[in-house]
Amino acid sequence: MNNPFTLKNKTIVVTGASSGIGQQVAISCSQMGAKVVLIARNKERLEETKKQLSGKGHLSISYDLTDLEHQKELVQGIVSKMGPIDGLVNCAGITATLPLKLMKPETVDELFRTNVFATIELTRQVLGVKNVNKEGASVIFFASIMGCVGENAKSLYSFTKGALISGCRSLAIEYAPRKVRINVVSPGLIETPINKNQPYLADPEKRKETESMYPLGLGKTEDIANTCVFLLSDAARWITGQNIIVDGGYTIK
């Protein structure tokens, strides 16, 4: 019986794969049968992630995606070793919490270069005619609920995530003739190792306050990874140009 949710025989590229959501996306994709290409800056953590993958035939690459000039060679190297790419999950990104008066041009440039420019360039290279599966593919941008709702001192981060949400719609139209689906995943607060050490989760009282904002409680990395697996699979073949909000009900209040 055909299983439209499987990722068997698919090659999936995951950025930011050395920790947090990106790491879990890579693990979950491998569990569903995919060959996974892991990309992140930290080589040691990448290798630790690779050890947790199911199956064989995976590839890990230590690379700083803000090096836009050499992304073409990066993608060519992946395709030469793994064959055409079936899916790209752009998990790599950074955040910032600061008011407008403290936003220096170099800080703005850093966030946009990491969250937006690197994502656009990698997607451009992956979707080259010779690099992507001719039968179709799936691309996922990672935004945030901060691209949909406001929060004090989060405007810079929101600028970058809003750009991905808006751009996704036009790209989805542009690449639909080639059966390439492009969607956005916008998570709420996820209990990653980094977030667990933040005051809003580490402090018991603040954690209780934070949890009260989420009708279904705080999310786990698996919740986001499962959404990505679905969007990468053939089960989502008729979904494109969408911003999938996965936030335990935060934005419905």
Language-model regions, residue ranges each:
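Active-site helix of classical SDR
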Residues: 123, 160, 168
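Residue(s) in the substrate-gating loop at a strand-loop-helix junction
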Residues: 144
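Short C-terminal tail/terminal secondary-structure segment
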Residues: 2-3, 149, 229, 240-253
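Conserved glycine-rich cofactor-binding loop
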Residues: 18-19
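Substrate-binding pocket helix/loop in short-chain dehydrogenase/reductase
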Residues: 99-100, 104-112, 206, 210
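Alpha-helical segment proximal to the catalytic Tyr-Lys
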Residues: 128, 173-177, 237
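Short, small/polar-rich loop/turn modules that mediate ligand/substrate recognition or access, typified
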Residues: 89, 176, 181, 239-241
